[in-house]
């Protein structure tokens, strides 16, 4: 079966047949993220992440289950490359600035180094000043999509990219594992989500995806 699949995706036309779903996009564009046989729950997780009609989604999974690679690498790339008109402003949020920088670096690495992306979508920095627009925490693509990384300490409400407010906000591991046993810290997280994140997405009718342990 896999030999036939490999032959089918050997051309751009073949690969394009699968990119309508997040699972298909991952298989043809990010195969290096899938060295192990997927579990049954991966298909369900991808279906939920890839459902544009789900405005509020929380995915809780054990460390190493693939939720972060699906939610913070595959999902923003898929939306930015396949649905730029629907998702022109993608926001990734993590607990700390260092974590934010890592999220953006992972996305940028695929945009710059992934041979399939280069073949099928071209240089996504073409016509964009990489020195100005490709930073440690922000990327603007040639199709106009902006991927912005923010930490919990930074303001979300009122953010704009050109005429666009955030179209999807993806929050990855919003709580530090070392602090999560403290009620005060958990209360601050809930206050932040209710007081900052949810009002921000309500302003623009955006999607909210939260990934946690």
Regions found by a protein language model. Name each.
Residues 1-213:
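Short, flexible loop motifs at catalytic/binding sites
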């Amino acid at each position: 079966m896999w030999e036939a699949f490999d032959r089918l995706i050997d051309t751009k036309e073949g690969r394009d047949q699968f990119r309508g779903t997040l699972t298909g996009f991952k298989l043809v564009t990010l195969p290096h993220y899938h060295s192990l046989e997927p579990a049954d729950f991966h298909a369900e997780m991808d279906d939920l992440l890839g459902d544009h009609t789900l405005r509020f989604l929380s995915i809780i999974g054990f460390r190493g289950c693939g939720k972060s690679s699906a939610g913070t690498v595959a999902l923003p790339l898929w939306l930015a490359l396949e649905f730029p008109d629907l998702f022109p402003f993608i926001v990734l949020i993590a607990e700390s600035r260092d974590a934010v920088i890592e999220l953006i670096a992972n996305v940028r690495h695929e945009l710059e180094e992934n041979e399939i992306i280069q073949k099928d979508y071209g240089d996504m920095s073409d016509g964009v000043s990489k020195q100005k627009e490709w930073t440690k925490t922000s990327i603007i693509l040639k199709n106009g999509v902006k991927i912005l990384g923010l930490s919990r300490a930074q303001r979300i409400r009122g953010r704009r990219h050109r005429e666009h407010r955030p179209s999807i906000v993806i929050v990855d591991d919003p709580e530090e594992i070392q602090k999560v046993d403290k009620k005060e810290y958990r209360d601050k997280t809930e206050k932040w989500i209710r007081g900052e994140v949810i009002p921000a997405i309500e302003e623009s009718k955006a999607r909210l995806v939260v990934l946690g342990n």
